[in-house]
């Protein structure tokens, strides 16, 4: 059964989100008001190295006042390819440039009230190109063994849907890295550098 939109009006608009009220006709013919949000999409990336470690960030989320481990990611800029967003955000937040970025899946995290497609990508390793340029994002950046990342899910120490779904997708694939062939490497790819670095007073651990 499908709900039918019969018109909508914007009640709040900003560059971050739009809140609207729609007149919706239900399958039985009744018309109701339905509040919903449209927001930019997001791109999240699972960067997995040859030792099956995952690049993770430990950070605080202001709105929920929660600390947790997350995958790199961020909002997709207007007319930006989400794959470019995913690679850019990883580099800005961690100093690592992902290699061999490819799409895993796209989902809606709150489809009943929010239109904001979230795109999950997988990368085969990353090259250290400098320190993070987004120095307010993470308390700590770490290359985490895949089994430890799985334990984060079981223990509730991941607090964002993109991180949970990204890790579950990789775990469902057996943690396998794709072999060369049929994968487009991101511009600037080079030989992988050392994994143990310190950026702007924040720890990057291997």
Curated annotation (Swiss-Prot):
<feature type="short sequence motif" description="Nudix box">
    <location>
        <begin position="74"/>
        <end position="95"/>
    </location>
</feature>
<dbReference type="GO" id="GO:0046872">
    <property type="term" value="F:metal ion binding"/>
</dbReference>
<keyword id="KW-0378">Hydrolase</keyword>
<comment type="similarity">
    <text>Belongs to the Nudix hydrolase family.</text>
</comment>
<dbReference type="GO" id="GO:0019693">
    <property type="term" value="P:ribose phosphate metabolic process"/>
</dbReference>
<keyword id="KW-0045">Antibiotic biosynthesis</keyword>
<dbReference type="GO" id="GO:0006753">
    <property type="term" value="P:nucleoside phosphate metabolic process"/>
</dbReference>
<dbReference type="InterPro" id="IPR000086">
    <property type="entry name" value="NUDIX_hydrolase_dom"/>
</dbReference>
<dbReference type="InterPro" id="IPR020084">
    <property type="entry name" value="NUDIX_hydrolase_CS"/>
</dbReference>
<dbReference type="Pfam" id="PF00293">
    <property type="entry name" value="NUDIX"/>
</dbReference>
<keyword id="KW-0460">Magnesium</keyword>
<dbReference type="GO" id="GO:0016787">
    <property type="term" value="F:hydrolase activity"/>
</dbReference>
<comment type="function">
    <text>Nucleotide hydrolase involved in the biosynthesis of the phosphonate antibiotic FR-900098, a potent antimalarial agent that acts as an inhibitor of 1-deoxy-D-xylulose 5-phosphate reductoisomerase (DXR), the first enzyme in the nonmevalonate pathway for isoprenoid biosynthesis. Catalyzes the hydrolysis of CMP-5'-(N-acetyl-N-hydroxy-3-aminopropyl)phosphonate (CMP-5'-FR-900098) to produce CMP and the final compound FR-900098.</text>
</comment>
<dbReference type="InterPro" id="IPR015797">
    <property type="entry name" value="NUDIX_hydrolase-like_dom_sf"/>
</dbReference>
<keyword id="KW-0479">Metal-binding</keyword>
<feature type="region of interest" description="Disordered">
    <location>
        <begin position="177"/>
        <end position="206"/>
    </location>
</feature>
<dbReference type="GO" id="GO:0005829">
    <property type="term" value="C:cytosol"/>
</dbReference>
<feature type="compositionally biased region" description="Low complexity">
    <location>
        <begin position="177"/>
        <end position="194"/>
    </location>
</feature>
<dbReference type="GO" id="GO:0017000">
    <property type="term" value="P:antibiotic biosynthetic process"/>
</dbReference>
<protein>
    <recommendedName>
        <fullName>CMP-5'-(N-acetyl-N-hydroxy-3-aminopropyl)phosphonate hydrolase</fullName>
        <ecNumber>3.6.1.-</ecNumber>
    </recommendedName>
</protein>
<feature type="domain" description="Nudix hydrolase">
    <location>
        <begin position="37"/>
        <end position="166"/>
    </location>
</feature>
<comment type="pathway">
    <text>Antibiotic biosynthesis.</text>
</comment>
């Amino acid at each position: 059964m499908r709900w039918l939109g019969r018109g909508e009006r914007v009640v709040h608009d900003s560059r971050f989100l739009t809140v609207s009220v729609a007149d919706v006709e239900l399958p039985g013919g009744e018309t109701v008001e339905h509040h919903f949000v449209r927001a930019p999409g997001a791109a999240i990336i699972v960067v997995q190295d040859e030792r099956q470690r995952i690049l993770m960030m430990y950070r605080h989320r202001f709105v929920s006042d929660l600390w947790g481990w997350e995958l790199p990611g961020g909002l997709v800029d207007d007319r930006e390819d989400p794959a470019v967003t995913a690679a850019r955000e990883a580099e800005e937040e961690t100093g690592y440039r992902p290699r061999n970025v490819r799409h895993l899946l796209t989902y809606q995290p709150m489809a009943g009230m929010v239109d904001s497609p979230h795109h999950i990508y997988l990368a085969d390793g990353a090259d250290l190109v400098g320190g993070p340029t987004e120095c307010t994002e993470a308390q700590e950046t770490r290359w985490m063994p895949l089994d430890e990342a799985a334990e984060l899910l079981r223990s509730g120490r991941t607090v964002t849907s993109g991180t949970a779904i990204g890790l579950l997708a990789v775990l469902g694939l057996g943690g396998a890295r794709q072999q060369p062939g049929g994968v487009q490497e991101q511009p600037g790819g080079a030989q992988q550098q050392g994994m143990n670095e310190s950026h702007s007073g924040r720890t990057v651990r291997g």
